[in-house]
Structure formats: structure tokens, C-alpha cells
């Protein structure tokens, strides 16, 4: 019945939201531990075994902080902007397939909140809309550093959203769909190349698109080495300079949830998602997403921050032409049927 499907969708969405929040909390622990190892330190190890309770302690500390509103801020917009960023962040996970249906008490439970035929466009649109929380927060703060950080973020998203979308056109051409379910099914086929039989993961047929997607995704999420909107040495803390307490935590939560959603999306689009060598399952998706999350941390530990002119030049002079080249090559391959794609 329709009402049963509706209730099941709400329940799956509620569970997914709580899982994302839990993963976000322990993503901070994971990042600090990995960075510490790379820098020959120990990392958080005092609160609980191996420091596993550190995210809880950090959350309690943030909730206990005073929520300060600057005197020259636009109060209403200042208060709402972080909530907007946080509310939009987990919505992208709603269209990511976490597996096939699950039978429980005679009811089929799809491991997917919403199956829409333009799922990838939906995720890209959310990425574009998410910048409104940043620009509104920077503008409403009444601080020049905050405003400059917000303007940087807007320009960065406009530049790299274009690269991100164009990098996926090759995947759309090969799969013939914008639905993540259809893209996942196409990758579950086997690819026969002479004596070799390989999974039809798009990282094999679209290596350039994969590299472009990774670079653009790091820039979209404002992570190092593309963290220009919150560059401490130039802008204090960028667009959230004036935020404190739990409102600061909303921006913090949104950034890490965006990282997790982008990692899940990359794993689904290029690495077969739940597809694995022995048996399909959500654990394969989790393992692949963990690889991308480690990639984020590794970049932060190894690369210095780009200059702003370098950041914009990379997008418009290097990545955009390469994305257009990849579309042309993929179209020719599809037209001529090379490699039985």
C-alpha cells in the first residue's frame, strides 16, 4: 500500500540521517588519528579507549559554549544560515542505493530513501543550493573576513560545479541514464577484454573523468588544499568567523556530512557501489567510501593551500578543457562501439 511505502521511506530516511550524524562524529576522530600518524604524533587518546569518546566530549563542549550574535549582524539571517547549510547536507544521501530490498515482517524495505530518475542532477543541484547557507552567513555576520570568505566559496562552487557536472557526462553516456540505480546495474555487468574479464566499473573506462571528479569534489567541499573560503592565515576563519557554540557546529557538521555524501557518490558512480568480488553488500560501499575519506585526509596532510588565482586558473584553464575532451572521446567510443561499452 502507498501509506506503507511512505512510512517505510520515512523510517529509512530517519535511520540514514542518524547513521550519517554518527559517521560524521567519528570522521573527525578518524581524521585526527590519521593526521597524527602522518605527522608522527599519537592523536586523541585520552577520552575513552583509543580516544573513541573524543567526538562526544567535543560535542558537549560546543553545546556548552555561548551563542554570540555580533551587534552589527543581520540577526535573523545570521541565525538561520547555519541551519540551512546543515539541513541541505544529508539530503544527497537519500538517492544513494545501499543495497537491494530487505524483507522484514513480510514488508519489502528498499535500502534507498528515494529512487528518482535524475538522481545525479538532484545531488548536483543540492551542492549548488548549499552555498546559500555560506553566502548568507558571511553576509549577515557584518564582518569583512566573513563576507570575503563567503564570496570566495561562491566563486569556487560556481567554477568547480561546472567541472563536477561535466566530468560525469561520460558516465551518463555509457550508462544511458541519470539514475544511480541504473548506473549501479550497468557496473554490475562484466567487461570482457580479450582474455581478461573485469568488472564494468566506470573507473576503468572513465579514468580521466574519475580524476576530474575527485579534484572537483575536494574543491566543492572546501577541503584542503582548496579550503580558500576559510583560510586561517588570510581570513581568520572565513565565513564562520563570527559563529560560536552550536551554530558553529552546524557548519562543521555540514562540511563533514558533505564529505561522506560525496565519498558515497564517488563509490557508486565509479567503483560499483555495493558491487564486490564475493557477494554484494553495503560493506563494500562503506569500504570504498572509506578509501575516499582517507584520500581527503591524505590531501590535507600532504599538500599546501593553493593561491586563489591558482585555484580559479586550475578550474577554467585545465580541468574544464579536460572535461570537454573526455566528453568528446567518450562520445566517439560510444558511437563506434569500441571495447563493447
UniProtKB/Swiss-Prot annotation:
It is found in: Cell membrane. It is an enzyme of class 7 (translocase). Its main location: membrane. It is a multi-pass membrane protein. The chain crosses the membrane at residues 6-26, 76-96, 118-138, 157-177, 198-218, 252-272, 278-298, 313-333. GO terms for cellular component: plasma membrane. Its EC number is 7.1.1.-. It catalyses: a quinone + NADH + 5 H(+)(in) = a quinol + NAD(+) + 4 H(+)(out). Keywords: Cell membrane, Membrane, NAD, Quinone, Translocase, Transmembrane, Transmembrane helix, Ubiquinone. GO terms for molecular function: NADH dehydrogenase activity; oxidoreductase activity, acting on NAD(P)H, quinone or similar compound as acceptor; quinone binding. NDH-1 is composed of 14 different subunits. Subunits NuoA, H, J, K, L, M, N constitute the membrane sector of the complex. Belongs to the complex I subunit 1 family. This is NADH-quinone oxidoreductase subunit H. The gene is nuoH.
